Amino acid sequence: MRHVYLGFVFLAFVCAGCNIEVNKSIEIGNDEHVQKNLFTVNGSIQVGKRCQVNGDCRVVNGSIAIDDDSQVRDLNSINGRISLGKKVTIRGDAVTINGAISSEPGTVISGDVSSINGEVDLRGTEVRKDIITKSGDIILRNRSIVRGDIRVDKRGLINDNSNRLYVNIRLADDSVVEGDIIVEEKDREVTVDLRGGGKVLGEIRNAEVLR
């Protein structure tokens, strides 16, 4: 999902099969099973504990929060953060524009984690594909593992005000990136901080490394 940002802007508004709520939040109680996509504009999505959502969660101008031991498919948010509790399973991607992404220990994200203008802060989490950012910092803690790469994409793909020149990537507490860390613009100032005990098994390209 190398150019996820442009695709998400389109898909968020053309959402076949979604029941779209406007100016209203969606709350799924503990232990519920949901067999549909959840999509709201100017509202948030809250999924309780031990839930199973066989659909995507999409929000414009609102946040997404998934509580402990729940399972969902793709998570997409414009102008809002994504918060994941303990032992959450995401059977797809987690994507934000203008919002942070955070997770608690035991969480597994099967796809990519992607953010514009927001920090990615993962604790004890497995990402089975890539982490992609344009201007947000990335922090991996508590033995988090990224099976793919970390990529800092080029600026200016869309009008997203993401032209921040400095990005910090910090790996702590024995966290590991199995692939590469790739900065796609040589004039972007990116620091990879491994002083907290993290490892990158692949290459680090176009970034300063602190050991």
Spans of features found by a protein language model:
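Intrinsically disordered, low-complexity terminal regions
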Residues: 1-211
